[in-house]
Amino acid sequence: MSRRHRAEKREIFPDPKFGDRDLTKFMNYIMLDGKKSVAERIVYGALEIVEEKLKREPIRVFHDALDNVAPEVEVRSRRVGGATYQVPVEVRAERKKALAIRWLTGAARGRNENTMRERLAAEMMDASANRGTAVKKREDTHRMAEANRAFSHYRW
């Protein structure tokens, strides 16, 4: 066991507009070089586009997108007697949220729309409707876990 002190989790404050902690975390993932105000403009702009196009509450669409992208199981490498097995394990709630946010932002960055807010809005709308690159990533992860179900007894 390590003797080092485990780093304390910093408190994340709710965002000023919607009062949502998940949205703040999302902004932190969008942020580059510590430019929080730019990240806020991008995220709020994307949510406005979502509201305009879908005529739905944007924060609801955002949460639907996160729920649809969050993986239930993933595979982790486990070495047993010279062989490395991909062992399927359940994803903890905290990691589930982090992966969903990471995959959603990554998919948005890889899109072809002109501005980041347009890309983010499009990916959020796709994810809330169970389409898009981020949802495909989750499906691939689940498929990997399903394919390696035989090794689930190596779980730790």
From Swiss-Prot:
Q: Which GO terms describe its cellular component?
A: small ribosomal subunit
User: Has keyword Lyase?
Assistant: no
Which one of the record's GO molecular function terms can you name? rRNA binding
Q: Which UniProt keywords are present, listed alphabetically?
A: Ribonucleoprotein, Ribosomal protein, RNA-binding, rRNA-binding, tRNA-binding
Q: Which domain of life is it from?
A: Bacteria
Gene3D superfamilies reported in the protein's UniProt record = Ribosomal protein S7 domain
Q: What does this protein do?
A: One of the primary rRNA binding proteins, it binds directly to 16S rRNA where it nucleates assembly of the head domain of the 30S subunit. Is located at the subunit interface close to the decoding center, probably blocks exit of the E-site tRNA.
NCBIfam families linked: rpsG_bact
| Biological-process GO terms, alphabetical | translation
**What name does the UniProt record give this protein?**
Small ribosomal subunit protein uS7
So what family is this one in? Belongs to the universal ribosomal protein uS7 family.
Sorted alphabetically, which CDD domains does this protein's record hold?
uS7_Bacteria (cd14869)
Gene that encodes the chain = rpsG
